[in-house]
């Protein structure tokens, strides 16, 4: 079906320029790249851009620690980031930096328009100040307890647990991250963006149906709690752009960071001597499409502040936000001590890029779900799918074609109806790529691969090859297998760019989406060379060990639970006495339908029953084994309403998480209801 060519601008969230790219970052960049490559295959004009987020106090302080200028540090980090993305074959048209002249000009332009339109407000605020370091403390350099959900150890601008945003002065028991000192209050004039003025527009945008349901629901919560004016200025010393006509005041990093999307595209247009496209893509009434691939941790900034800034400065809003979840490794948060905090460059020293691209793609959907990189499953899936199903289809047929027919395929299809089944799948698979239902696309493709291999098994060319007078049958069977391989590789081209290059070299033709409608008949292929090698767990072991060694080299040689989870600040005996710990008997334990993390526990406190949800399913895959066991619970924790019911307390467990978590039990003789003292 012929499609009308679209103009599309695609971005990934800008990596912060004070650290290396790791496998968590790569999920987003791979997801976006697969989608972009598919769009290009369908004939659309796609500009795929990114940049380093290069401003802020963390950059300034790290450069000071290294004894170099911030400019030198971000320059070196940009080269490292670009090398990593190139290693994973992320097909950016441009990779720039927010510390650029284009970004400065655009930041000042947007700010001036917002100010002219009455959306910038000035007022004096009381701000946290580090008396030991002699500096105002930016949001991320204050930590304390979230004022909304009371989660400890949260940054000064937003809570990573509940997603709330707030002022650093709202933190409970704040501490300076720089010195550990308790901050004091000092007055300073700041500039605020009047976000509440855009509430009606943002709510209409939310209800348009374009956003993911989970994003729209979260935004509705923020609307109900009320939008607040947003502080867009920071005091010197600060590494960033100084605000025009405001000496000593700088744009907050989150103001100029998303403008970096525009800056990178402007830089690309200038490189092309293109004076038209920037306005064509960013003007208010643009018909081009604009998509931001982002993680769920920065939805607030992209769904509220960014579209409001664009609206208030007379630029177009994003067409959509494509939001993804986090990456876990082996069922747990990435851990430096366990060697599962893996840098992109370390991965490429042990595996190829296509393997991770395939595994992530096979697990991704359009939902905001976390993705688990199970390294054992990774090895099994890559070998089973890429090697055994796809590549093997070519190798088991190519030998006969090369040796017996000088590489020339048959002039007719052996099974036209089977070939039509494969090409008819283009609509379903294409729609899955388009809608970011990547896992569905992979399942459809692998089902076809099974069908193709079943055909070859049934036709048994190795038997036909030994039978006199059946050369034509042999050529037809093997040509059919190679044509089916071509269709499969065409569908997988957005995912496996390097394997695609090798497949195209063998097939002696470029793989195009529409090209599969015409099979390769009477076509000469090149001599077959191994397309892909099997992988094994020894490579995984080497990868994990290398990651551990990198951590040792980069930090103090202290490893273990205390290194991963340092002891919290001292509390008083009175604080501890508020927590009522009791012995509880586990009367029943069962899975929670709809959750892959929770168990539902029925606890007997010696006269009172409690229903508790606990995230220990990975560690206890057989919940029945817990029945009859004694454990320790927090008995006076306020009940918490969850999607699955109300949790009436918390059981105590130790360990880093995932499968490595251990339920606490008292010594023999302890009875349900006994208080822990």
UniProtKB/Swiss-Prot annotation:
Co-factor: note: Binds 1 zinc ion per subunit.
Motif window: 'HIGH' region: 15-25
Keywords: Aminoacyl-tRNA synthetase, ATP-binding, Cytoplasm, Ligase, Metal-binding, Nucleotide-binding, Protein biosynthesis, RNA-binding, tRNA-binding, Zinc
Residues reported to bind ATP: 336
UniProt-listed Pfam families: Anticodon_3, tRNA-synt_1g, tRNA_bind
Binding site residues for Zn(2+): 146, 149, 159, 162
Enzyme kind, highest EC tier: ligase
Cofactor(s) listed: Zn(2+)
EC number: 6.1.1.10
Sequence motif 'KMSKS' region, location on chain: 333-337
Principal subcellular localization: cytoplasm
Subcellular location: Cytoplasm
Domain tRNA-binding: 575-677
GO CC field: cytosol
Function: Is required not only for elongation of protein synthesis but also for the initiation of all mRNA translation through initiator tRNA(fMet) aminoacylation.
Family: Belongs to the class-I aminoacyl-tRNA synthetase family. MetG type 1 subfamily.
Subunit composition and interactions: Homodimer.
NCBIfam families xref list: metG (TIGR00398), metG_C_term (TIGR00399), PRK00133.1 (NF001100)
Protein's name in the database: Methionine--tRNA ligase
Species this protein is from: Shigella sonnei (strain Ss046)
Species lineage: Bacteria, Pseudomonadati, Pseudomonadota, Gammaproteobacteria, Enterobacterales
């Amino acid at each position: 079906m012929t499609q009308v060519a679209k103009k599309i601008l695609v971005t990934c969230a800008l990596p912060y320029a004070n650290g290396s790219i790791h496998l968590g970052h790569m999920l987003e960049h791979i997801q976006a790249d697969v989608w972009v490559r598919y769009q290009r295959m369908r004939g659309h004009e796609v500009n795929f851009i990114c940049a380093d987020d290069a401003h802020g106090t963390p950059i300034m302080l790290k450069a000071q620690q290294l004894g170099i200028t911030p400019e030198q540090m971000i320059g070196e980090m940009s080269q490292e980031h670009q090398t990593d993305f190139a290693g994973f074959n992320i097909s950016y048209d441009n990779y720039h930096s927010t510390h650029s002249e284009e970004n400065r000009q655009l930041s000042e332009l947007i700010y001036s328009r917002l100010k002219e339109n009455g959306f910038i407000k000035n007022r004096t605020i009381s701000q946290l100040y580090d008396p030991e370091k002699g500096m105002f403390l930016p949001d991320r350099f204050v930590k304390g307890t979230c004022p909304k959900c009371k989660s400890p150890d949260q940054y000064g601008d937003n809570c990573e647990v509940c997603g709330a945003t707030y002022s650093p002065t709202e933190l409970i028991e704040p501490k300076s991250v720089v010195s550990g000192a308790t901050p004091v209050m000092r007055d300073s004039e700041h500039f605020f963006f009047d976000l509440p003025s855009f509430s009606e527009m943002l709510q209409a945008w939310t209800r348009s149906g374009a956003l993911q349901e989970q994003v729209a629901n979260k935004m509705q919560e923020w609307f109900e709690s009320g939008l607040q004016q947003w502080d867009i200025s920071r005091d010197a010393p600060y590494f960033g752009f100084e605000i025009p006509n405001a000496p000593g005041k700088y744009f907050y990093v989150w103001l100029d960071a998303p403008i970096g999307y525009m800056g990178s595209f402007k830089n690309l247009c200038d490189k092309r001597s293109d004076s038209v496209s920037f306005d064509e893509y960013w003007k208010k009434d643009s018909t081009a499409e604009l998509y931001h691939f982002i993680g769920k941790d920065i939805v607030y900034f992209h769904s509220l502040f960014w579209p409001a800034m664009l609206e208030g400065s007379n630029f177009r809003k994003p067409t959509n936000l494509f939001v993804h979840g986090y990456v876990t490794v082996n069922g747990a948060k990435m851990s430096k001590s366990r060697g599962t905090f893996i840098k992109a460059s370390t991965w490429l020293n042990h595996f190829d890029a296509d393997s991770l691209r395939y595994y992530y793609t096979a697990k991704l959907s359009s939902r905001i779900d976390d993705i688990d990189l199970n390294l054992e499953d990774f090895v099994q899936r890559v070998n089973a799918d890429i090697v055994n199903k796809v590549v093997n289809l070519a190798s088991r047929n190519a030998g006969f074609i090369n040796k017996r027919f000088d590489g020339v395929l048959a002039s007719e299809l052996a099974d036209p109806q089977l070939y039509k089944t494969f090409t008819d799948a283009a609509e379903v698979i294409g729609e899955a790529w388009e809608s970011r239902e990547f896992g569905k696309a992979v399942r459809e493709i692998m089902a076809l691969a099974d069908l193709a291999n079943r055909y070859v098994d049934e036709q048994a060319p190795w038997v036909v090859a030994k039978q006199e007078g059946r050369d034509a049958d042999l050529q037809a069977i093997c040509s059919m297998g190679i044509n089916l391989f071509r269709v499969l590789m065409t569908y997988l081209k957005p995912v496996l760019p390097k394997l695609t290059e090798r497949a195209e070299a063998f097939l002696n033709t470029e793989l195009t989406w529409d090209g599969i409608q015409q099979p390769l008949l009477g076509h000469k292929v090149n001599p077959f060379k191994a397309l892909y090698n099997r992988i094994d767990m020894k490579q995984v072991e080497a990868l994990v060990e290398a990651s551990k060694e990198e951590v040792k080299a980069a930090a103090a040689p202290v490893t273990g639970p205390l290194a991963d989870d340092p002891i919290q600040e001292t509390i008083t005996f009175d604080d501890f006495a508020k927590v009522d710990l009791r012995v509880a008997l586990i009367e029943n334990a069962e899975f929670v339908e709809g959750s892959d993390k929770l168990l539902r526990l029925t606890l007997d406190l010696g006269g009172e029953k409690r229903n508790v949800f606990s995230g220990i399913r990975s560690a206890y895959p057989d919940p029945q084994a817990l029945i009859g066991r004694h454990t320790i619970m927090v008995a006076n924790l306020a009940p918490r309403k969850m999607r699955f019911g109300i949790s009436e307390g918390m059981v105590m467990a130790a360990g880093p998480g995932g499968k490595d978590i251990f339920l606490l039990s008292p010594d023999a003789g302890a009875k349900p209801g006994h208080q822990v003292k």
